[in-house]
């Protein structure tokens, strides 16, 4: 592969990165149309779809509250104690013998740590209007939040970062992500681009992931934790889809040292034209959102897990800047 040929050249990681710039540029240009979609996502205003509509449901507010209580593995006695109400009253609410006030619905939802979208569903089931708005990211009232996300993404360069919605659909990226996706099928890079599908799909970057088995285990476990918290059926379907993907041809069997128990974090080790790059990721969310869209937005930032990865990405960025300066000089 091109990554192996580049990695075999003499010199330090930074030197190898500079030597590979022309090769990388050529490979990326071959997929300009597909990658332009990813690069274009660094504008949040057009990346988010319109607010979703609620489907009618016959479940009562008591049914929903009981489901959330059981999902949180709380007994009626424990929830009643934390909510400072009687167990009898909670039992009446769950059975439908008592209709909770708007304040009581919100009080119980807070104790159960129910997501904002589901809190709206609880209110509607109880006969009240939704409390939390769901605006598209293009809404002028979210301009400050948009700017904050764009600043975080841009400020993370030369390392890759992306913003995703609750279903892991990419809504924005920085410019460092595109070159890492040059091996993905253009069909998978058409909006909406799902980050998890892109990483594990046979036509995505799965064949480029060196530690595919460990990464797959990490992705599925993380997705399951989200499902346990949110009860999101779309995430459940996504998990089943990802779990059914075949092992990429040539994938190496997991090594004992790759066990998550032996690491501080599960890295993403990616085979690229620069050689094997290794990343660990962090997740950033809004601290006190009162908008459904913002409450479901997360930024995944990838950091270099070794000095070679850091040097390679810095070298690539330096050469891009140099090419830009030369191009501007030639145009004058």
Question: What name fits each language-model region?
Answer:
Residues 65, 79-80, 90-93:
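Conserved hydrophobic/aromatic packing and binding residues within compact polymer-binding modules
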Residues 70, 81, 110:
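Alpha-helical residues within the helix-turn-helix
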């Amino acid at each position: 592969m091109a990554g192996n040929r580049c990695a075999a050249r003499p010199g330090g990681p930074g030197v190898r990165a500079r030597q590979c710039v022309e090769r990388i540029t050529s490979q990326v240009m071959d997929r300009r149309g597909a990658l332009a979609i990813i690069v274009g996502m660094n504008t949040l205003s057009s990346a988010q779809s319109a607010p979703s509509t609620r489907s009618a449901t016959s479940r009562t507010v008591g049914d929903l509250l009981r489901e959330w209580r059981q999902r949180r593995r709380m007994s009626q006695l424990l929830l009643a104690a934390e909510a400072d109400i009687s167990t009898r009253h909670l039992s009446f609410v769950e059975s439908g013998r008592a209709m909770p006030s708007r304040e009581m619905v919100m009080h119980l939802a807070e104790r159960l740590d129910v997501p904002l979208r589901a809190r709206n569903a609880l209110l509607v089931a109880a006969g009240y209007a939704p409390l939390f708005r769901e605006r598209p990211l293009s809404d002028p009232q979210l301009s400050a939040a948009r700017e904050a996300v764009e600043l975080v993404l841009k400020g993370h360069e030369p390392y890759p970062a992306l913003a995703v919605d609750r279903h892991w659909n990419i809504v924005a990226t920085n410019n460092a992500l595109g070159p890492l996706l040059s091996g993905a099928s253009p069909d998978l890079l058409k909006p909406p681009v799902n980050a998890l599908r892109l990483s594990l799909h046979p036509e995505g970057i799965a064949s480029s992931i060196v530690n595919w088995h460990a990464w797959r285990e990490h992705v599925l476990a993380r997705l399951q934790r989200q499902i346990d918290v949110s009860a999101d059926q779309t995430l459940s379907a996504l998990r089943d889809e990802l779990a059914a993907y075949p092992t990429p041809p040539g994938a190496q069997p997991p090594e004992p040292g790759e066990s998550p128990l032996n690491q501080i974090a599960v890295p993403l080790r990616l085979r690229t034209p620069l050689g094997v790059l290794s990343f660990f990721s962090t997740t950033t969310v809004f601290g006190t959102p009162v908008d459904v869209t913002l409450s479901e937005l997360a930024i995944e930032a990838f950091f270099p897990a070794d000095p070679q990865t850091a040097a390679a990405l810095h070298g690539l960025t330096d050469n891009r800047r140099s090419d830009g300066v030369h191009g501007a000089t030639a145009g004058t």
